[in-house]
C-alpha cells in the first residue's frame, strides 16, 4: 500500500454552531465481547477548518447559526459530489491491505519540559501550542518538509521594560515579568474564530494569562491580559466555541469563573463576569459544550440545530461528581452524577451527541448521557426524531441537590488513572462509532484509542517513549501528544494498525489447575464499527416507553415516598416490573418547567399511573443490555477436565476424598511466606553425601508423618489426561480393598523374588541400611583401581547424574504436594533430560516401540492369576509399570529390604550364568531361584535363540498359551509371555552359532516379543500413583532395585520401555548405568564382543557400540560431545541447553527457588552462567533466607555449595550511581545494552559488547566529559584534578604530571598544582 499522506492544510471547517440532534443512546456494554460485521459508512468530514474557505467570523445573536467560513464561497452541488467521490476513493485506497507499520508521522524533541498541548484553531496554518513548567512554544508542522515540527516562537523569554499596559492590568506581574515560569499544573488552550490568535496558560498556580501569538515580544508585549481571582491553583480553563470571547476556569478553591475578554481587555478590570461556587469541592476539569456545525459539511445530516450549546458547560470534581450547568440559570445544576468512586480527573463532550466521557483515578473511563429525558420518540430515521419529541426537565429534582442514581452508559476499565481523554472531532450518526483517545499519568507509555463499539479491545495503541502528558486531535485522522521525555509526537491513525490486526483469531489453551481445563475460541475478528441497521432502544418503537427514573417535582402531589422510591430503584436494577402499589395515584402528573420555549405535550398516559417500568427509551443501566442483532458472539467451549476426572476417580476411591482438603496443605498455602519457607526446607539444593546421611533420619521421620496422615493427593488429579492414562483402570477397579490387597501382593512378590537379598538386610533395621550404604561406597571405590582415566571420569559422571535424577524426582514430588503444576513439570522435564545423558554415556539402546502394547507381569504383580490379568488387559493398554512414578523411587521406598551384598556380586558368575541360561525355557523359573544368575548382556531390542546342531531357529509359532504359563512355589507369577510372533525372529547362520557351544547342549527356545507399548506421559506417571512419596531414595536402595530389575531383564528383556521416553520405566537403563558406576564393565571376563552369538551383521551402528570395549565407547562419547558443541546438532532436549533456558525463564519470571536450584545442582556440570552471577545470586538468596529466619537452610547452602567466599562477594564493593553531566539523568544505558546483546547474538562478534559502557548517556545521546588532555571519551580509569575539577585518563594525566613534569592543569588553569 502506498504511504500517501494527506496534507493537513486541506479544506476543513471550524464549526461554530451546536447541532442539537436527539441522542442515540445505549445501555451498559454486556460482559461478552461483541464483534460487529463490516459496514460501509458515509465518510465523516473533519472538524477542523478548511483552507480553501476564507475566514469569516460572525457574532450575531445566540440563536443564529454561526459559521466559520464564507458562505458565498460554499461549493456547488457538483463540487460537493466531486469532493465526496474523492473522499470515497481515498477511503478505498486506505482500506486495502496495509503493512503493519507504525503511523507515527511527526516526532521532535524539545529542551523544555512539556505538560500540555493544544492546536491553533487557525485554518491558514498547521500550528500547535505547547506549554510546560518554563516553556510556552508556538510550533508548526508540515507534511511536505519531511514531516518536521519546528519551533516558531517561544513566549517565556523576558519582556521589554516599557509595558505600561501590563503594569496597569496587574501591578504584581511587574515583579515576575523578567522570569516567566508556568505552573507545574499548567494547561493551555487556544481561542476560536476572532480570538483564534489568543492562547490561555497558567503563569503560576492562580493566574491565567492570555497571550497573542501574532505579537513579537521584541516589539510588543504578547501578554494581552491576565485573570487572578482564584484563591488556589487553577486546574482547567476553556474557550467557548460559539461565544468566542467567553473563557471559563475552575480551580482547587471550588470556584467556577467565567470571563469575557471584551470587557476585560481594555477596561483593566480583573473581575469575572460570573462566579459559581461548587461548595469547596475542588474542580479538576471544566469544559464548554462544543458548537461544531456539522450540517454545513454533511448534506445527509438531518438533525435539528439549536443555539443552546454556548450556554452549557460541565465540570468534574475531586469528589467524583459530574455537574452540568446552564449559565442562564447559574444557581441551578441541571445534572449531578456520581461519576467516579475517587477523584474525577478529566472530561470531554461528544462532538455532536449529548454524551460526556469522564476519567478518574479509579482507572475507569465512563460515558454518561446528559441530554434531556425522552418520553416518546417515534423514529423517522436513524439519529433523528420528529418535532413532537417531548423534552422533560429535571429542574425541581436537582434544585434539592439530589444526586442522580443513574449508572454510566458504558465503562471502559483502563487499569490506570485517566488524566486526558478526548473524542475524535468527527460527526457520528451512531454514537457507538465514536473514537475516544485516553492517556494516563502513570507509567504507561502509550495513548489508547477506543471505539465505543469494543470497549474491551482498543482500536489503536500509540506507543511513546515515556508516559503521555497531553493530547489533542488535529482532525479526525491526526492526533498529537506530548510525553515526559519532552517529545511532541503525531500519528495518522489511518496508517496505524489496529490491535485486532496483531491478535490471533483462533486460540486453544490449557488451564493446569482449577477452573476450565480447556478453552477453545474460534471467532471472526470483527470490526470497530457498529452495524448501521442497529437501532438503539431509545428509538425502538417496539419497546414500551417510560421515564428514565421518574424524577417528579418535590412539591408535586404525585411524588414517590422515600422508601418506595428506593424499592423501585432496586427492582429496576434487576429488570423486573414494579407492582402498581409502588406509585401513589394522588392526582395527575404536573408538567415540569422547561428551559426552552417549546410547547409541552402532556403526560397523561395511564401507563404511568399504574406501574413503574424500567426505562427503555433512554440510555440507562436500568435497561436491558444492548441487543446487537445479527452479530454472532465468539464461540467459547469450556471443558472442565479436572472436575470431571476428580469426580470419576474420587467416586471409586472414597477413602481418599478427605485428602483433597488436607489441613497440612491448607496451612502451607495460607500465605506466600509459608509456601516459600516450606519449599526452602524441603527442596534439595545439594547432593553432598554428608548432608544426605545427616538428613536420613529426618527423611524417615517425614515419611512416617506422611504415612500416618494418609497418602498424598497428587497434583495430576487436577490436570488433563491422554489416551494412555490409567484413570480408566482406577474406575474399573471394584473396591478399595482389592487395591490394598494387590498392593500387599506386590510387596510379598518383591520379598520372595530373592531370598538372598532378604536375608542380608532387615527392612526394620535402619542401622543395617546405613552399613549397606557404606559398604557400597567402599566397593565402588575399590572398583576404580586400575581403571583408565576415561573410565573413571565416565563413572564419576554417571554417579553424579544418577544422584541428580533422584534429586529431581524429590523436588518434583515436593511441588506436587502443594499442587504447583508448572514447577512439577519443570523438574520432571529436567529428570527426563538427565536420563538422556545417562543413556548416551552408557550406550544403552532404547527398547522397541510399536503401535500395539503388551503387559509384561514380573515381580511387581498386582493380580492373583493370569485369567484376572487378561480380563483387565482389555480395559487398559498400560502395564503395571505406569502405576509407579519412577523405578528409582517406587521400588526403593516400598521395598527397602531388597538390598543385600549379593546384589553387588551378580555379575561375578557371568560365565556360569551364560551356560546355565542355555537350559530349556521350562526350567527358567527354577534356574532363577536356584542359581540366582544374572541377565546375559544382550541388547534389549534383539533376542536370539541358538541350536546345537547349527541350524536355524525353529518355528515357534505353535507355542500354545499354556506353555507360556509359569508357576512358582509361592504361586507368584514372575513371567508372562504373550503369544509369540516369529515373523520377526532373527535367523543366524550356523557358523555364527556353533562357536563356543559345547557338544550335546540343548537348544534355547525363548520366543521373541515384537510388540511394545506406547509412550507413557508424565501425566500417567503421577495420575496412577497417589501414594507418591516425597523423600528421595538412598543410593544403596537404588542399586538394590537394579539387582531385582536384572532378574526381570532375564525373564523378558524385550518388554522394557526406554527410560528416556518415560521417567517411570528405567530398570533396564539403570541396570547398565549402575554396572558402569561399579566399575565392572571394563573387567568382565566375557564382554558382548566375545559373545558366542555374533550379531554384528544384524545390529544397527548404535547397537554395535554395545559390543565394543569401554574405551571405545568413551572415545565415541567424546567425539559425540565435540559434535554437540555445534548448536545445529544439539537436540532440543539436550540438558545443558534446556537448563540454560529454564534458568533464563526463572530469572525473568522471578522464580528464585528454581534459579538457585539450577545453579547449585547443575552449574559445575553444565556451566549454566558465569561464576560472578552464581556468587551474586547465592549471596542474595542467603540474604532472603535470613530475612525469613531460615538460618539453618542458609548455613547448609553455604556449607555444601561448590564455591568459596560467597559472603565476601560484597565485602569491598560499593554502588556508585553515575549521572549525566549534560542532562542530569541517571546513566543506566539499558537500551544500548539490549541492542549490543542482540548484535552479539546475531553476529557472534564478541567485540560488540566493547562498545557498551557508562561513558555516554542514552537519554541525551551525548558522551560524558572528555579527557582534558586527549579529548577522547573516558571509558576506564579516570583521574580528576581537585584544584580545578578537570578530568582525564589515568594514563594521560600520569604522563602529563609525572613523565613531563607539568605542574598546571592541561586545560590551562593558572593555579599551580
Curated annotation (Swiss-Prot):
Regions of biased composition (Basic and acidic residues) lie at: 70-83
Superkingdom per UniProt: Eukaryota
| Organism (species) | Vanderwaltozyma polyspora (strain ATCC 22028 / DSM 70294 / BCRC 21397 / CBS 2163 / NBRC 10782 / NRRL Y-8283 / UCD 57-17)
Q: Where are the WD repeats?
A: 180-221, 229-269, 339-378, 442-484, 711-752, 795-837, 1100-1143, 1190-1229
What are the recorded GO MF terms, alphabetically? zinc ion binding
Q: Which PANTHER family match?
A: GATOR COMPLEX PROTEIN WDR24
Protein function: May be involved in a process influencing telomere capping.
Q: Where is the composition biased (Polar residues)?
A: 1-17
Annotated region described as Disordered, given as residue ranges: 1-22, 38-83
Gene name linked to the record: RTC1
The protein here is known as: Restriction of telomere capping protein 1
Cellular compartments annotated:
Vacuole
Q: Which InterPro entries match?
A: WD40/YVTN_repeat-like_dom_sf, WD40_repeat_CS, WD40_repeat_dom_sf, WD40_rpt, WDR24, WDR59_RTC1-like_RING_Znf, Znf_RING
Amino acid at each position: 500500500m502506498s504511504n500517501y499522506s494527506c496534507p493537513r492544510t486541506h479544506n476543513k471547517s471550524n464549526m461554530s454552531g451546536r447541532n442539537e440532534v436527539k441522542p442515540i443512546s445505549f445501555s451498559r456494554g454486556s460482559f461478552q465481547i461483541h464483534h460487529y460485521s463490516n459496514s460501509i459508512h458515509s465518510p465523516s468530514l473533519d472538524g477542523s477548518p478548511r483552507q480553501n474557505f476564507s475566514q469569516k467570523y460572525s457574532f450575531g445573536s445566540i440563536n443564529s447559526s454561526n459559521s466559520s467560513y464564507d458562505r458565498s464561497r460554499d461549493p456547488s452541488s457538483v463540487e460537493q459530489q466531486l469532493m465526496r467521490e474523492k473522499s470515497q476513493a481515498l477511503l478505498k485506497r486506505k482500506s486495502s491491505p496495509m503493512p503493519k507499520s507504525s503511523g507515527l508521522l511527526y516526532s521532535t524533541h524539545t529542551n523544555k519540559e512539556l505538560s500540555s498541548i493544544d492546536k491553533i484553531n487557525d485554518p491558514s496554518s498547521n500550528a500547535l501550542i505547547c506549554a510546560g513548567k518554563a516553556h510556552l512554544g508556538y510550533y508548526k508542522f508540515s507534511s511536505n518538509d519531511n514531516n518536521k515540527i519546528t519551533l516558531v516562537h517561544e513566549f517565556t523569554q523576558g519582556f521589554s521594560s516599557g509595558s505600561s499596559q501590563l503594569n496597569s492590568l496587574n501591578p504584581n506581574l511587574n515583579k515576575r515579568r523578567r522570569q516567566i515560569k508556568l505552573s507545574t499544573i499548567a494547561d493551555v488552550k487556544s481561542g476560536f474564530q476572532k480570538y483564534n490568535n489568543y492562547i490561555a496558560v497558567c503563569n503560576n498556580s492562580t493566574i491565567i494569562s492570555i497571550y497573542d501569538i501574532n505579537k513579537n515580544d521584541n516589539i510588543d508585549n504578547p501578554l494581552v491580559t491576565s485573570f487572578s481571582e482564584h484563591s488556589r491553583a487553577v486546574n482547567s480553563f476553556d474557550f467557548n466555541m460559539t461565544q468566542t470571547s467567553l473563557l471559563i476556569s475552575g480551580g482547587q478553591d471550588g470556584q467556577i469563573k467565567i470571563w469575557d475578554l471584551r470587557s476585560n481587555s481594555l477596561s483593566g478590570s480583573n473581575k469575572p463576569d460570573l462566579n459559581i461556587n461548587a461548595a469547596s469541592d475542588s474542580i479538576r476539569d471544566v469544559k464548554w459544550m462544543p458548537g461544531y456545525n456539522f450540517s454545513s459539511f454533511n448534506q445527509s445530516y438531518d438533525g435539528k440545530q439549536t443555539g443552546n450549546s454556548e450556554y452549557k458547560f460541565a465540570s468534574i470534581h475531586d469528589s467524583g461528581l459530574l455537574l452540568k450547568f446552564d449559565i442562564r440559570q447559574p444557581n441551578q445544576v441541571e445534572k449531578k452524577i456520581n461519576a467516579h468512586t475517587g477523584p474525577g480527573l478529566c472530561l470531554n463532550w461528544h462532538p455532536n451527541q449529548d454524551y460526556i466521557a469522564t476519567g478518574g483515578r479509579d482507572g475507569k473511563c465512563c460515558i454518561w448521557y446528559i441530554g434531556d429525558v425522552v418520553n416518546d420518540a417515534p423514529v423517522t430515521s436513524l439519529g433523528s426524531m420528529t418535532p413532537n419529541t417531548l423534552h422533560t426537565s429535571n429542574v425541581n429534582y436537582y434544585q434539592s441537590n439530589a444526586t442522580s442514581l443513574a449508572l454510566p452508559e458504558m465503562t471502559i476499565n483502563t487499569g490506570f488513572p485517566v488524566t486526558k481523554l478526548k473524542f475524535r472531532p468527527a460527526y457520528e450518526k451512531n454514537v457507538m462509532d465514536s473514537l475516544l483517545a485516553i492517556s494516563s499519568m502513570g507509567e504507561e507509555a502509550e495513548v489508547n484509542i477506543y471505539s465505543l463499539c469494543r470497549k474491551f479491545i482498543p482500536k489503536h495503541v500509540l506507543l511513546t517513549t515515556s508516559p503521555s502528558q497531553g493530547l489533542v486531535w488535529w482532525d479526525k485522522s491526526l492526533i498529537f501528544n506530548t510525553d515526559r521525555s519532552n517529545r511532541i509526537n503525531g500519528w495518522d491513525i489511518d496508517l496505524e494498525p489496529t490491535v485486532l490486526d496483531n491478535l490471533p483469531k483462533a486460540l486453544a489453551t490449557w488451564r493446569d489447575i482449577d477452573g476450565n481445563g480447556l478453552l477453545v475460541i474460534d471467532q471472526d475478528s470483527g470490526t470497530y464499527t457498529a452495524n448501521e441497521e442497529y437501532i438503539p432502544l431509545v428509538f425502538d418503537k417496539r419497546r414500551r416507553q417510560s421515564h428514565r427514573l421518574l424524577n417528579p417535582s418535590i412539591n408535586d402531589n404525585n411524588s414517590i415516598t422515600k422508601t418506595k422510591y428506593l424499592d423501585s430503584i432496586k427492582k429496576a436494577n434487576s429488570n423486573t416490573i414494579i407492582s402498581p402499589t409502588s406509585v401513589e395515584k394522588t392526582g395527575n402528573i404536573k408538567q415540569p418547567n422547561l428551559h426552552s420555549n417549546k410547547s409541552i405535550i402532556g403526560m397523561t398516559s395511564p401507563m404511568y399511573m399504574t406501574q413503574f417500568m424500567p426505562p427503555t427509551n433512554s440510555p440507562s443501566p436500568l435497561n436491558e443490555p444492548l441487543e446487537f442483532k445479527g452479530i454472532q458472539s465468539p464461540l467459547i467451549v469450556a471443558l472442565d477436565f479436572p472436575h470431571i476426572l476428580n469426580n470419576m476417580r474420587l467416586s471409586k476411591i472414597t477413602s481418599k476424598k478427605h485428602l483433597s482438603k488436607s489441613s497440612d496443605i491448607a496451612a502451607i498455602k495460607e500465605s506466600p511466606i509459608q509456601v516459600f519457607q516450606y519449599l526452602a526446607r524441603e527442596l534439595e539444593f545439594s547432593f553432598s553425601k554428608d548432608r544426605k546421611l545427616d538428613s536420613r533420619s529426618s527423611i524417615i521421620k517425614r515419611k512416617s508423618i506422611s504415612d500416618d496422615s494418609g497418602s498424598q493427593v497428587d497434583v495430576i488429579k487436577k490436570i488433563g489426561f491422554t489416551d494412555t492414562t490409567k484413570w480408566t483402570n482406577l474406575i474399573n477397579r471394584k473396591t478399595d480393598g482389592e487395591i490394598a490387597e494387590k498392593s500387599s501382593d506386590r510387596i510379598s512378590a518383591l520379598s520372595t523374588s530373592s531370598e538372598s537379598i532378604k536375608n542380608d538386610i532387615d527392612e526394620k533395621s535402619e542401622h543395617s541400611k546405613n552399613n549397606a550404604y557404606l559398604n557400597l561406597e567402599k566397593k565402588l571405590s575399590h572398583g576404580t583401581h586400575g581403571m583408565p582415566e576415561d573410565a573413571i571420569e565416565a563413572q564419576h559422571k554417571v554417579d553424579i547424574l544418577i544422584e541428580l535424577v533422584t534429586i529431581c524426582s524429590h523436588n518434583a514430588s515436593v511441588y506436587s504436594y502443594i499442587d504447583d503444576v508448572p514447577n512439577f513439570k519443570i523438574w520432571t522435564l529436567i529428570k527426563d533430560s538427565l536420563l538422556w545423558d545417562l543413556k548416551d554415556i552408557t550406550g544403552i539402546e532404547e527398547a522397541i516401540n510399536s503401535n500395539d502394547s503388551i503387559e509384561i507381569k514380573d515381580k511387581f504383580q498386582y493380580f492373583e492369576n493370569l485369567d484376572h490379568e487378561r480380563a483387565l488387559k482389555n480395559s487398559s493398554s498400560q502395564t503395571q509399570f505406569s502405576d509407579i512414578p519412577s523405578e528409582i523411587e517406587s521400588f526403593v521406598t516400598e521395598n527397602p529390604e531388597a538390598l543385600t551384598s549379593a546384589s553387588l556380586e551378580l555379575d561375578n558368575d557371568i560365565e556360569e550364568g551364560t551356560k546355565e541360561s542355555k537350559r530349556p525355557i521350562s526350567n527358567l523359573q527354577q534356574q532363577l531361584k536356584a542359581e540366582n544368575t544374572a541377565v546375559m548382556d544382550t541388547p534389549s531390542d534383539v533376542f536370539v535363540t541358538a541350536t546345537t546342531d547349527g541350524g536355524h531357529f525353529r518355528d515357534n509359532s505353535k507355542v500354545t498359551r499354556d506353555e507360556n504359563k509359569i508357576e512358582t512355589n509361592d504361586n507368584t507369577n514372575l513371567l508372562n509371555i504373550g503369544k509369540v510372533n516369529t515373523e520377526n525372529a532373527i535367523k543366524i547362520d550356523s557358523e555364527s552359532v556353533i562357536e563356543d557351544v559345547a557338544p550335546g547342549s540343548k537348544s534355547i527356545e525363548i520366543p521373541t516379543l515384537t510388540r511394545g507399548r506406547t509412550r507413557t506421559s508424565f501425566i500417567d506417571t503421577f495420575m496412577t500413583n497417589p501414594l507418591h512419596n516425597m523423600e528421595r531414595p538412598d543410593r544403596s536402595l537404588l542399586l538394590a532395585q537394579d539387582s531385582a530389575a536384572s532378574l526381570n531383564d532375564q525373564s523378558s528383556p524385550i518388554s522394557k520401555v526406554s527410560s528416556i521416553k518415560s521417567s517411570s520405566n528405567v530398570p533396564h537403563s539403570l541396570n547398565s548405568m549402575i554396572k558402569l558406576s561399579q566399575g565392572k564393565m571394563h573387567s568382565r571376563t566375557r564382554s558382548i564382543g566375545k559373545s558366542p552369538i555374533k550379531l554384528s551383521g544384524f545390529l544397527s551402528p548404535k547397537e554395535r557400540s554395545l559390543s565394543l570395549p569401554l574405551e571405545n565407547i568413551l572415545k565415541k562419547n567424546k567425539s559425540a560431545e565435540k559434535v554437540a558443541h555445534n548448536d545445529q546438532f544439539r537436540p532440543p532436549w539436550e540438558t545443558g541447553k534446556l537448563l540454560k533456558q529454564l534458568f533464563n525463564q526463572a530469572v525473568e519470571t522471578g522464580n528464585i527457588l528454581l534459579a538457585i536450584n539450577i545453579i547449585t545442582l547443575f552449574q559445575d556440570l553444565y556451566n549454566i552462567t558465569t561464576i560472578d552471577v552464581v556468587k551474586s545470586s547465592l549471596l542474595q538468596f542467603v540474604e532472603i533466607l535470613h530475612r525469613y529466619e531460615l538460618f539453618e537452610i542458609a548455613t547448609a547452602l553455604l556449607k555444601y555449595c561448590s564455591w568459596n567466599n560467597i559472603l565476601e562477594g560484597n565485602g569491598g564493593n560499593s554502588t556508585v550511581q553515575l549521572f549525566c553531566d549534560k542532562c542530569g539523568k541517571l546513566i543506566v544505558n539499558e537500551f544500548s545494552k539490549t541492542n549490543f546483546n542482540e548484535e552479539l547474538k546475531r553476529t557472534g562478534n564478541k567485540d560488540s559488547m566493547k562498545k557498551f559502557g557508562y561513558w555516554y548517556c542514552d537519554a541525551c545521546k551525548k558522551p560524558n566529559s572528555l579527557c582534558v588532555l586527549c579529548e577522547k571519551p573516558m571509558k576506564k580509569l579516570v583521574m580528576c584534578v581537585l584544584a580545578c575539577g578537570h578530568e582525564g585518563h589515568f594514563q594521560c594525566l600520569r604522563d602529563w604530571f609525572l613523565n613531563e613534569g607539568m605542574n598546571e592543569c592541561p586545560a590551562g588553569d593558572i593555579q599551580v598544582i
